[in-house]
Design a protein with these regions (language model features):
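Charged C-terminal helix
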Residues: 52, 226-270
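Short pre-catalytic strand/loop immediately N-terminal to key active-site residues, enriched for Gly-Thr
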Residues: 7-13, 191-205
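N-terminal basic/disordered segments at the start of proteins
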Residues: 14-30
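Conserved N-terminal subdomain of the carbohydrate kinase-like
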Residues: 2-6, 26-109
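Conserved phosphate/ATP/ADP-binding segment of small-molecule kinases
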Residues: 117-191
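Short, small-residue alpha-helix embedded
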Residues: 19, 142-143, 201-225
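Phosphate-handling active-site elements
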Residues: 29-33, 192, 218-232
Length: 270
């Protein structure tokens, strides 16, 4: 069985972060492992608390994973401090990690920065050059490329700028900012559009985590990058189309929409 590792924060509501990553990886047919960067207290209405692990403990988690069940792919989500980012980069180099998918979580949809400038600098210098593919949304791509993105042409220019600078592939996600579900993959000097169905579902908590984890899962299964993106987009469309409605705010998707067997059935009252 192929294996995948997620390095990210825990979401107590289960919709994003480590929990979304593990659900996604299992649903995409790989064995999921995790190294937790932080615990969060949150639900569908917001985050009320964050407790980071120490760099030493994060390193210990990664040592235990890589020396026993070596991951065929690695997904990296939100890491909020430069010390943690540096520790991750050091361990990925030490163990010669492969198929590294970086979701550079830096900016909220509102435009507010989620991590410090010091952490962003560490992300740029340590982690991004190690990536197989980056999966920024529009605000994140604007930060990395140093330009505003208001059109598909801007997405192409930004992805090329980022990919050329960090020597990796870039999947620039359209999403809500451009009011479509079309994503741009830039790599090796060329680009390809992946067109998706826009699904009118307000419950989109964890979509970025889910997409990057699905890509990592498919890379672990030896699909090439184009195929991995295509399959990941199809999976996330299914999870959104299942129209799960939980919580008082922007709720989670149904990551297990395709899993149906005798163990998933609810009890029927006679």
């Amino acid at each position: 069985m192929r294996t995948a590792l997620t390095i990210a924060g825990s979401d107590s509501s289960g919709g994003a972060g480590i929990q979304a990553d593990i659900k996604t990886m299992i649903s995409n047919g790989v064995y999921a492992m995790s190294a937790i960067t932080a615990l969060t207290a949150q639900n569908t209405t917001g985050v009320t608390g964050i407790m980071e692990v120490t760099p030493e403990f994060l390193g210990e988690q990664l040592d235990n994973i890589f020396t026993d069940i070596y991951p065929d792919a690695v997904k990296i989500g939100m890491v909020s401090s430069s010390d943690l980012i540096t520790k991750i980069a050091d361990k990925l180099k030490e163990y010669d990690a492969k198929n590294i998918v970086v979701d550079p979580v830096m900016v909220a949809t509102s435009g507010a920065r989620l991590i410090s400038e010091e952490a962003i600098d560490a992300l740029k210098s340590c982690l991004l050059p190690m990536a197989t593919v980056l999966t920024p949304n529009i605000p994140e791509a604007e930060v990395l490329a140093g330009m505003k993105i208001q059109s598909q042409a801007d997405m192409i220019r930004a992805a090329e700028e980022i990919g050329t600078k960090y020597h990796c592939a870039v999947l620039c996600k359209g999403g809500h900012q451009l009011n479509d579900a079309n994503d741009l993959l830039w790599r090796d000097g060329g680009y390809k559009w992946f067109y998706g169905e826009w699904i009118d579902n307000p419950n989109t908590h964890g979509t970025g985590c889910t997409l990057s984890s699905a890509i990592a899962s498919n890379l672990a299964k030896e699909y090439d990058l184009d195929e991995s993106v295509e399959r990941a987009k199809k999976y996330i469309s299914g999870a959104l189309a299942a129209m799960l409605d939980l919580g008082k705010g922007s709720g989670p998707m149904n990551h297990g929409f395709a899993i149906k067997n005798e163990y998933t059935e609810s009890k029927v009252e006679e």
